[in-house]
């Protein structure tokens, strides 16, 4: 029998799940597509004869598509409402997944990848705008953590489940299934997410909307935090989302399915850590200190990967530690939200996301070029030095951005915590 004390808790959980669930599922599609190449990238590269540079470019174009949409996306969210924008993105994303699945060669594969990136570009930003509209500011980091955590189910599906389905029906068949699931989730969002309502930016002219972008760029602390967005998430997306699979294959001999299960463990650790970091920021002393701690832990794990010879079990353990360390993303996101007044919410958070996705595009492109510059071994695998270069680049990039961020002060105001 349920006690009176348990009933409010159960009711609160159901209400929270009903609110965040459809948004998280749609964001999960984006997470799946971001990280799928970490498992099936070697298979696609072998089938279509792609070099490491080409594979890095293919993965990074998804993020470049995000970059080019962020400013107009922020204006659209503030003017027309996040739900409308997200539903338009579902149509484009599903079409892009379908094109990707049926691509006969590199050019069509690239076109499909870009379409999916354009379509998915609103899924997280639109969800954050809805959270900012529907929930109090002091709960934003918590809900951002829930959204990132539950949405990372897509990251989990892009590991062992994707590997198993690919082994059964091939990567093309797997992506056709994902296209159908995307449409179904879009219908759930259309039915279950609260309707858009007029915002402070609804009646703005285009000139006023663009002026709002400039105002957002001038907020104190914007640029150091922008750089932390660029370096932080790109470390995870470049390691787990792209090179961890080849690293596990080339250095430790793991096949497709083994790679999938190892990446599942790392991604599951990240999911749990995302929700934990979202709650820890107050206990750790606020946004700034929490971000410094998470970034320092991430840099340390990258340096260990670069310089310490690891056995197979230790390598898996380090990958899990890295995934936990880099999961401070909800705090970075909440710090970004705290910089902007309500009327600039859409533009502000999408500008920060421009840094996030731009950082991934740059890091994945550079690391692919580094891998090819060092070159393959006679058997076709990449040597340890190639992966060492990847880890060192990511550690240096994050370290530089952290040094610039070091002087930032804790934000104050109605959205601070």
Residue positions per predicted region:
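Cytoplasmic helix-loop-helix junction between adjacent transmembrane helices
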Residues: 112-151
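Helix-breaking motifs and short loop linkers at transmembrane-helix boundaries and internal kinks
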Residues: 49, 81, 102-108, 119, ...
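Extracytoplasmic gate region of multi-pass secondary transporters
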Residues: 37-38, 220-277, 363-368
């Amino acid at each position: 029998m349920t006690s009176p004390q348990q009933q409010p808790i159960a009711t609160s959980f159901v209400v929270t799940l009903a609110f965040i669930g459809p948004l998280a599922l749609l964001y999960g599609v984006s997470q799946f597509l971001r990280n799928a190449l970490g498992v099936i990238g070697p298979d696609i590269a072998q089938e279509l004869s792609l070099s490491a540079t080409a594979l890095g470019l293919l993965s990074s174009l998804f993020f470049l598509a995000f970059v080019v949409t962020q400013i107009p996306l922020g204006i659209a969210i503030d003017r027309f409402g996040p739900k409308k924008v997200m539903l338009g993105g579902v149509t484009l994303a599903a079409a892009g997944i379908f094109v990707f699945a049926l691509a006969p060669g590199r050019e069509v594969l690239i076109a499909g990848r870009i379409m999916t990136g354009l379509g998915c570009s609103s899924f997280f930003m639109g969800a954050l705008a809805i959270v900012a509209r529907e929930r109090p500011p002091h709960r934003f980091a918590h809900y951002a953590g829930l959204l990132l955590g539950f949405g990372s189910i897509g990251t989990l599906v892009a590991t062992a489940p994707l590997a198993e389905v690919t082994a059964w029906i091939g990567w093309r068949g797997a992506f056709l299934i994902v296209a159908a699931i995307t449409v179904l989730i879009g219908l759930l969002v259309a039915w279950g997410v609260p309707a858009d309502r007029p915002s402070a930016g609804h009646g703005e002219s285009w000139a006023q909307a663009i002026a709002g972008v400039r105002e957002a760029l001038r907020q104190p602390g914007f640029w150091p935090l922008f750089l932390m967005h660029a370096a932080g998430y790109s470390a995870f997306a470049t390691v787990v989302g792209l090179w961890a699979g080849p690293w596990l294959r080339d250095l430790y001999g793991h096949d497709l399915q083994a790679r999938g299960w190892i990446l599942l463990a790392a991604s599951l650790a990240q999911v749990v850590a995302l929700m934990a970091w979202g709650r820890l920021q107050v206990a750790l002393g606020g946004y700034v200190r929490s971000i410094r701690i998470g970034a320092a832990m991430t840099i340390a794990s990258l340096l260990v990967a670069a310089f310490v010879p690891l056995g197979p079990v230790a390598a898996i353990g380090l990958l899990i530690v890295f995934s936990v360390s880099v999961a401070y993303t909800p705090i970075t996101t909440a710090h970004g939200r705290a910089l902007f007044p309500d009327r600039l919410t859409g533009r502000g958070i999408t500008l920060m996301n421009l840094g996030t996705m731009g950082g991934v595009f740059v890091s994945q492109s550079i690391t692919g070029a580094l891998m090819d510059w060092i070159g393959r071994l006679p058997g076709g695998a990449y040597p340890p030095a190639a992966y060492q270069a990847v880890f060192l680049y990511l550690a240096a990039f994050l370290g530089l951005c952290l040094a610039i961020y070091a002087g930032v002060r804790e934000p104050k105001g109605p959205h601070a915590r």
